[in-house]
From Swiss-Prot:
Keywords: Molybdenum cofactor biosynthesis. CDD domains: MogA_MoaB. May be involved in the biosynthesis of molybdopterin. It comes from Bacillus subtilis (strain 168). GO terms for cellular component: cytosol. PANTHER family: MOLYBDENUM COFACTOR BIOSYNTHESIS PROTEIN B. Pathway: Cofactor biosynthesis; molybdopterin biosynthesis. This is Molybdenum cofactor biosynthesis protein B. PROSITE patterns: MOCF_BIOSYNTHESIS_1 (PS01078). It comes from the Bacteria.
Length: 170
């Protein structure tokens, strides 16, 4: 079966939980979370939940697992906490939970960041994606430029296809 045939079998609507990881953002100042939601809604997807979670490993794991275990959620999208500062713990929180990792997401995101956005600073991005409890999980940096790049070039074009692949044998 071709990639196009797989995409045709993918769901039209993906139910998503959006998590902004930040010690400082609020509902009023969370530009990147709102941008992520806007891209998802414009693509016809449904926002099942949205929250802002502090840069704390246990709190992040609880929030991600709650989304992944919710039968009304097909994907969890995080923004923030992917850098190399001590408080950036998103990757440490979610990667141990992955049953499968999608290394191509981070690799291609960094390549696009290098060529189209921030140049050599892309080496500090630890964006990643994987599968937790038959749920797609994507983690992007928290800058609005990074969210826009990830959503436009990678997540929106493949989100439904990824969900289809994860759930086809379930």
């Amino acid at each position: 079966m071709s990639v196009q045939e797989h995409k045709q079998e993918a769901p039209d609507i993906v139910r998503c939980k959006v998590i902004t990881v930040s010690d400082t953002r609020t509902d009023e100042t969370d530009k990147s979370g709102k941008l992520m939601i806007s891209f998802l809604e414009e693509a016809g997807h449904h926002i099942a939940a949205y929250e802002i979670v502090k840069d704390e490993k246990d709190a992040l794991q609880r929030s991600v697992l709650a989304g992944c275990m919710d039968e009304q959620t097909d994907a969890v999208l995080l923004n923030g906490g992917t850098g190399i500062a001590d408080r950036d713990v998103t990757i440490e929180a979610i990667t141990p939970l992955f049953s499968k990792e999608l290394p191509g997401f981070g690799e291609i995101f960094r390549m696009l960041s290098y060529t189209e956005d921030i140049g050599s600073a892309a080496i500090m991005s630890r964006a990643t994606a994987g599968v937790i409890q038959h749920t797609a999980v994507f983690s992007t940096p928290g800058s609005s430029g990074a969210v826009k790049l990830a959503m436009n070039k990678l997540i929106i074009p493949e989100l439904a296809h990824v969900v289809r692949e994860i759930r086809k044998d379930k």
